[in-house]
């Protein structure tokens, strides 16, 4: 099939926000968490990103494999393949590992891989990851299957709604990977956090959901700050 078309950096599309921040020094290693649901092509993407430049170990305290790899063509970029999970609730060892990695190891960015054929289920984790306020890019995987089934996804509208770059890819066919890396490196280098999405504002500003959410946030704000956790995630 034909390659997946998508605007590259500076070629239009929604997500080209300039934060005004200077880029991180070239000596800084750009570390990325690769996160996503089970069976969404995450391991395939990790292999495409890193090739044979991989190291397999264990996360401390649990029998969960940890895979780290240097991104091909970017010697100063390191990707950690996190276990496949459906939420950030720390109920399983896999969820606990992912939560600890993002909150305690402070990656410079998150690559969230999403199954384009099952977006609704995948976006629950996406929204939780966005609340961590870490620079993030969404890899919309299996777009070749969507295309072959005659479907389409309005990627630019999705970017506008989420406030993060959304890059259509096919990890299995090695399509869109270079663009994904370009966007991931960009948001990490310039520390572009996800756009603030307050979906409880969908109706009136003073709606009940909005009032309840912000009342809770005011109660836990100090505790979240002490724990070093973004208040919306807490």
What spans do the regions from the language model cover?
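Conserved G1/Walker A P-loop phosphate-binding module
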Residues: 1-92, 103-105, 109
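Residue-level signature of catalytic and energy-coupling elements of molecular machines
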Residues: 33, 45-46, 64, 79-81, ...
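Flexible phosphate-sensing "switch/lid" loops adjacent to ATP/NTP-binding sites
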Residues: 44, 98, 217, 221
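Conserved nucleotide-binding/hydrolysis micro-motifs of P-loop NTPases
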Residues: 52, 61, 84-86, 116-120, ...
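Helical mechanochemical/support elements of P-loop NTPase systems and associated helical scaffolds
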Residues: 60-67, 78, 90, 94-97, ...
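Conserved C-terminal guanine-recognition region of P-loop GTPase G domains, centered on the G4
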Residues: 69-77, 97-167
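Canonical P-loop GTPase G-domain recognition
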Residues: 144-201
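Extended helical scaffolds that flank P-loop GTPase cores
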Residues: 163, 190-234
């Amino acid at each position: 099939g034909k390659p997946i078309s998508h605007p590259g950096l500076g070629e239009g599309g929604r997500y080209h926000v300039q934060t005004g921040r200077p880029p991180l020094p070239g000596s800084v290693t750009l570390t990325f968490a690769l996160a996503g649901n089970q069976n969404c092509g995450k391991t395939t993407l990790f292999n495409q990103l890193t090739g044979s430049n991989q190291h397999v170990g264990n996360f401390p305290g649990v029998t969960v494999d940890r895979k780290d790899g240097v991104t091909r063509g970017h010697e100063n970029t390191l990707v950690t393949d996190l276990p496949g999970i459906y939420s950030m609730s720390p109920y399983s060892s896999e969820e606990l590992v992912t939560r600890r990695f993002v909150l305690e190891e402070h990656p410079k960015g998150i690559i969230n891989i999403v199954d384009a054929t099952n977006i609704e289920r995948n976006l629950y984790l996406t929204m939780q990851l966005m609340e961590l306020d870490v620079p993030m890019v969404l890899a919309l995987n299996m777009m070749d299957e969507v295309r072959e089934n005659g479907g389409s996804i309005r990627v630019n509208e999705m970017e506008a709604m989420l406030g993060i770059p959304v890059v259509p890819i096919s990890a299995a066919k090695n399509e869109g990977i270079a663009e994904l890396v370009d966007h991931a490196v960009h948001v990490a280098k310039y520390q572009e956090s996800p756009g603030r999405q307050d979906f409880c504002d969908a109706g009136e500003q003073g709606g009940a959901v909005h009032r309840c959410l912000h009342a809770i946030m005011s109660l836990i704000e100090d505790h979240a700050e002490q724990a070093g956790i973004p208040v919306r995630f807490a």
